[in-house]
UniProtKB/Swiss-Prot annotation:
An annotated GO BP: translation
Protein name: Small ribosomal subunit protein uS8
Subunit-level organization: Part of the 30S ribosomal subunit.
Keyword rRNA-binding attached: yes
Gene Ontology molecular function: rRNA binding; structural constituent of ribosome
Function per UniProt: One of the primary rRNA binding proteins, it binds directly to 16S rRNA central domain where it helps coordinate assembly of the platform of the 30S subunit.
Name of the encoding gene: rps8
Native organism: Pyrococcus horikoshii (strain ATCC 700860 / DSM 12428 / JCM 9974 / NBRC 100139 / OT-3)
Entry keyword set: Ribonucleoprotein, Ribosomal protein, RNA-binding, rRNA-binding
Similarity comment: Belongs to the universal ribosomal protein uS8 family.
Keyword Heme: no
CC annotations in GO: ribonucleoprotein complex; ribosome
Amino acid sequence: MTLLDPLANALSHITNSERVGKREIYIKPASKLIGEVLRVMQKYGYIGEFEFIDDGRAGVYRVQLLGRINKAGAIKPRFPVKATEYEKWEKRFLPAFEFGILIVSTSQGVMSHKEARDRGIGGRLIAYVY
């Protein structure tokens, strides 16, 4: 069976593991995009430490959970967003103003919508976390 969206699978695995109270999980297969999303989540305090483990195949991420995630999910389709439109998408995907983050893929890398808005750059929405 083929895995169609590894990012959506990883985020649902994180959400489900948080709900049952796990403290450490393994996400496979690993990818650069999943690693960048984990980095943004760690920067905002949603997860603890994470590390890449090379298993000779696609690799695995070991992630420490802190119990701070209510919901995390991938945004499909990957909507293009201008630098001035972030508020509209916040209202659509986040439960309250300034609560949670949208993760955006920009020409300057993967970052949160807050960081992208401060830099004045647009991109494509790839995930949300709150």
